[in-house]
Amino acid sequence: MAVKRYDIPYYLDVFNIPGFLKDPVLIFGFQDCLYGRKISMRSRIKERTKLWTEMRLRRKRGWIKSRPVTAIPEEFQEKSLSDILKNFGLRDVRTMDYFDKRADIVRDMNLAIDELLKGVFSTVIDIGSLEHVFDTKQCLWNLFRLLKVHGYLFLYTPCNGYFNHGFHTFSPECIIRAVEMNGFEVKYLKYSTRDGFELEHPNIVSDAILWLAAEKKEEKENFVIPQQGCWADIYKRQV
């Protein structure tokens, strides 16, 4: 995905977590800033009418917490996420991508990362790349291993809808449990619509995003595979 105007409040939340902004930083996927889309007026009216009708209904029911802002802070008036991070005082910001030739590191995240990259970074950021990688387990494990202990992982990924956007849309439980079981402590967790409305739960709207930031507390030797908790609860009640 990319940095969008309506998502800026969530970025500011995460950037203000103590210890999050620390060199060196790796961004998985070269991320441009898209603060305006070129679409036809008819499509725009149709899209906005549907969105705002949906939002009004859900806000009345208390499911929508806030309305997104439209002002772009000075620090975010850049062309890429890398440049934005430098405005926050970071100096060693690198990008990893398989297709975009602007990236500093070219890697296929379906494959294990090089040993030389393990434990190198203090912050690893993925805003919408995980869902495009076929091998989710390997990709997550790579992201985990790129980090130093006490480093921060920032994930932004679809958790409802987004049909035909990427290979996957993830259950929040899948991502949260995978992160926690592999040595991380979640420090930030929110859900939003594609246009930045904060949600109580991702099943409220057709397309929803999970925002997660977690601190790496320990190094695991092997990936710990999560199990879906609801089935354990169901069978436990049947005993």
Q: What is each of the regions a protein language model found here?
A:
Residues 1-23, 32-46, 50:
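Class I SAM-dependent methyltransferase Rossmann-like catalytic core
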Residues 24, 171, 207-210:
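Residues that flank catalytic or metal-binding motifs in active/ligand-binding sites
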Residues 26-29, 213-215:
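Short beta-strand segments
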Residues 197-239:
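Core SAM-dependent methyltransferase catalytic element
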